[in-house]
UniProtKB/Swiss-Prot annotation:
Name by which UniProt lists this protein: Pentatricopeptide repeat-containing protein At4g32430, mitochondrial
Domain of life of the source: Eukaryota
Chief location: mitochondrion
Entry-linked PANTHER family: (WILD MALAYSIAN BANANA) HYPOTHETICAL PROTEIN (PTHR47926:SF524), PENTATRICOPEPTIDE REPEAT-CONTAINING PROTEIN (PTHR47926)
A matching Pfam family: PPR
Amino acid sequence: MTLLNYLHCNRSKSFLFQRFYSPYRIAHKLFDGSSQRNATTSINHSISESLRRNSPARALSIFKENLQLGYFGRHMDEVTLCLALKACRGDLKRGCQIHGFSTTSGFTSFVCVSNAVMGMYRKAGRFDNALCIFENLVDPDVVSWNTILSGFDDNQIALNFVVRMKSAGVVFDAFTYSTALSFCVGSEGFLLGLQLQSTVVKTGLESDLVVGNSFITMYSRSGSFRGARRVFDEMSFKDMISWNSLLSGLSQEGTFGFEAVVIFRDMMREGVELDHVSFTSVITTCCHETDLKLARQIHGLCIKRGYESLLEVGNILMSRYSKCGVLEAVKSVFHQMSERNVVSWTTMISSNKDDAVSIFLNMRFDGVYPNEVTFVGLINAVKCNEQIKEGLKIHGLCIKTGFVSEPSVGNSFITLYAKFEALEDAKKAFEDITFREIISWNAMISGFAQNGFSHEALKMFLSAAAETMPNEYTFGSVLNAIAFAEDISVKQGQRCHAHLLKLGLNSCPVVSSALLDMYAKRGNIDESEKVFNEMSQKNQFVWTSIISAYSSHGDFETVMNLFHKMIKENVAPDLVTFLSVLTACNRKGMVDKGYEIFNMMIEVYNLEPSHEHYSCMVDMLGRAGRLKEAEELMSEVPGGPGESMLQSMLGSCRLHGNVKMGAKVAELAMEMKPELSGSYVQMYNIYAEKEEWDKAAEIRKAMRKKNVSKEAGFSWIDVGDTEGSLTMQGFSSGDKSHPKSDEIYRMVEIIGLEMNLEGKVAV
């Protein structure tokens, strides 16, 4: 008989029973509770250790095994469930199963379990489910709020939630501050960030490293270098993230290049460990600087520290060298990289346009799939008409891969086809774009305008204005089209002017210059001057536009005054400016002043004269009768004289009756462009004026033999006064194509007689 049975049987010995049995029962209960706690701790430790070793599958397996053994409730608790949910790592199916089990077993009443469930749904991409659970929590803690806050992907919604947290009296912790500050972008977000900074002291987190780093990032992203630096300097302890946050923010801003380099230097002096973020940030800074030497020094440091072959560092180095046009350095970095992605290959394609297609093929062979930026680089590599077939192949590949509907790709195709005058293909590319931005419309309008299709440009502008909001480049292109179109009424330009005034775009230099140029080319120089005077900021383009306007109107004195004022304002003239000034000198017959300006362009501003500059000088000398000097200057033109220069020289030979030189120049012009009538007509007139009729007849005979005919000259008249008037009526000498031509000729005769009676001279 056991002692226990004995004690039960012998009740008379109650003292012994109480003495021995009661302590045994208590000890058994204590032992059972202790072993249960130890078992729970052991299971939780096993799951936690698996997670620490990045083995979520093993963690879930341990949870499942113990669940099957029926240990839940005895050896597993709310901590076990939290760890199991953490192990799901976005596995929605298992997460939902554990969530269901937590609900049926009543463990969702523990706020930590609900937090874990919300975290699981957030990681699985089911943020709505997490939000629904949160809204039904009776007493959410700060972790609950933080879990939801970290799940937002919209800055404004996240900031509204932060305001809600403040209103609910939630005491922010370091995670709350760092997460909230990551959403503080833009002016509204920055203001909220400043408010949060004022509350940090109250929570005692002003010295927290994570919070300090978050404030540095917020200030840096908002472009407040002083604010970021102040937070940085006030931090009692700084880690590598602190330095990198300051450095990265400055490099992205782009206007604090020098400061970023100084901070990088200080990091090295302080012995702070540099990582790939440090190097990519400072190299990005070099992209904003013109000092290539600095970039090479940092590159050398990358090599010493073993970071050159890293993907992020290699890509940013390639980008830097590409922007500087150092192709060999781009290639060198590319070949040193141990890993390459689409950014690496795309940079190579964009940098090396001559071999862009072969690089693209190697990229595909390497198993890297292109993106829209890759195709934009490929399209831009098509440089001449002979390569247009390559462009068509690229277009076909874009159609197959679906990138043709991407706006950036479509816009590049529009620009490409417009450059090579393939406007039907440009229209097709435009129609293939699914969501047309204003850039797409601008590309089409500009393409039509540049190719002389002014009516189409105007119609495209009207369609764009009906569908989207035009910007300064839209107006710049359409005004350019109107400026050069003699058969479009100037009223259309005035309507565009009124439209852009309503949109507040009149202060944009691009728009003002286009307006100024349009009015000048259409004969309204007073309106051009008015636009110019109303501009608060005048850049090189604006000055050139007003000088060109007065030059086209033959106002030499005003041109020279504006030119000298431009220089006095420290605005450097460019080739177009000098061409306009030379044109004014030519029309005024100021040859010596023209020579002075021509030499200034070369010697003072180091500008290489173009064919147009030489042509203007040759014409200027020729008109002044200095034909020998003109001939000598013509022989100095790089690549030889062009057709327009020869025509100009031929006109001067006719003006001064130099038959011998005229014949020589005409022969060169006819060899260059045998199909054009200008040289034949000019030479015929030279012979006719000298009464050398036999030679004049030979010119006529040569024209008939080569089927060369003189092109008819056209004039235009604006007769429309209605709002819908888009065009002007064109006519040529002796033109009778109009159905009312007889009435028109009679009216012209009457007007001519009336002009004579008024003392006016008809021209």
